[in-house]
């Protein structure tokens, strides 16, 4: 298997995140990505390829995200930093809401409240470059599948499954998984996205919610107890043409592998019924029992069991894992 490594996977970004009212060091640290890369090369002996920054942005970036949102991400730091008392992180402290749904004043403070959906998604200098490094790796992995590879892995940082069409959330600004799925759909027609992160993949869900060519399946802890809190419920099944093509499988806190496998098997059966041409896996591992931001009870050895199941289901299709 080829592994495509984002050129920005080890940059020291982001800094801090507001989590349950406390400012903490962001969990998506460079050290984590460096350790994953070492395991890919030394333990799994994958063919690791560092992706070079593409000369042009892929068209799927603009198909998945709103133009005004992308413009904001590209220019936010420069505009924010012009203020003499600007912080080193762009962070919202006033937001649009039901009383003020539109922005009459287009200034850095109000724009941050419009496009950054929580306190855990700050922007820093070079953020735009870093995000696009992840996009390039996701697209490279998708292109490898299109070229005939049976499977491919993309090591991405920053992550993307919380990023919505025009809103950053959960430390995610650009929806890497959705961009890969969008690119693959043009070649294979039907794409399934399986998200195994402990947190609901709200961004991927929102982007494909009204489509029937992309099935989105998310296994996660109950939204009453875990981010993003406001979505990820089982009755969110899609709308319009996409009704029935979104599947959420929330689990109680403390769920161990025995209980997890029941939900996992349901997810695989739904994917089999959909009969996709390609499977994209958003592979978060914060279901691990000692993860400080999760609440499930999955152990290290359990991931091998899940991986083997994914290999078996991907036999009639192709498989791409997005981490």
What are these regions (language model features)?
Residues 1-194, 199-314, 318, 323:
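HDAC/HDAC-like amidohydrolase catalytic core signature
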